[in-house]
């Protein structure tokens, strides 16, 4: 499909720089496909679900992936900003660096600017390799848990570029940019639909008879990238590691068999569920990387309802929601949201989408 079909203009004032407070006060646009767009709030979510439905949340935890440092391996130093984007092994990470032109393979970076130190001393990394678009492979002096602790001590929350370009990350972001379900470290971006949940909302959902299941998908920086090719056929999707346990698969399959609906909280949960689903709709255990790319024409196997934030133009995520609820439906929904002052992106409002009827069998 042509990429420009997924383009739209978003006024800068619609981009949220802070989350709603309290979190349940964020707005929620309900899109059922009947032509009626309903303006609600996150606090209304239990009213749209039925006993036996299963919410599926992503329990990944965002690491402090933004690091400041300096190149120390030459006669003159140079300031370096690095964003960790993918763990390669116990001591190596793939990272995006700025300015990339200041680094060569073999250079050493010492992280810990702005008065920050880690308990084990300074954190050095060697540039093992350098890619064409600013990505580098960093080999750190620490390994495993020691490296994780050093990154936590020295790093900052890796805010998305549309927020970081307007203001620096602060201590409040360390709380705001983490869901209440966060348990397993590895993400460099938050599964943002989960940011809307509070213990009180979870209690109301359980009282309604709605189940809650956890999966893990470590969100990568590629989630923010626009599709740059003119046709979606030419886009190469980024890979992210995910896990869905046998116990969770069994609980979801039992709920489906009893008439319950699968409600994905966020596109990350959606992508993992669809990656784990078999052709007959059975959800299988899963532990691997997925690079599933969902565009209109895809036949959904697992998910019935999707709760998600509002996404970037030309992004793979806007393509995903258009596949789920219909392109024309989502174009109308986004136009309504923009006109009505909904807040977009990571700290913004949400929409609740019901899957469009589609009997076509189209493999991903």
Swiss-Prot record:
GO molecular function: S-adenosylmethionine:tRNA ribosyltransferase-isomerase activity
Pathway(s) per entry: tRNA modification; tRNA-queuosine biosynthesis
The keyword S-adenosyl-L-methionine belongs to this UniProt entry's keyword annotation: yes
Catalysis: reaction(s): 7-aminomethyl-7-carbaguanosine(34) in tRNA + S-adenosyl-L-methionine = epoxyqueuosine(34) in tRNA + adenine + L-methionine + 2 H(+)
A Gene Ontology cellular-component term: cytoplasm
Leading EC class: transferase
Gene Ontology annotations of biological process type: queuosine biosynthetic process; tRNA wobble guanine modification
Major subcellular site: cytoplasm
EC number per UniProt: 2.4.99.17
Family from the record: Belongs to the QueA family.
Function in brief: Transfers and isomerizes the ribose moiety from AdoMet to the 7-aminomethyl group of 7-deazaguanine (preQ1-tRNA) to give epoxyqueuosine (oQ-tRNA).
Protein name: S-adenosylmethionine:tRNA ribosyltransferase-isomerase
Species in which this protein is naturally found: Bradyrhizobium sp. (strain ORS 278)
Taxonomic placement: Bacteria, Pseudomonadati, Pseudomonadota, Alphaproteobacteria, Hyphomicrobiales
Gene behind this protein: queA
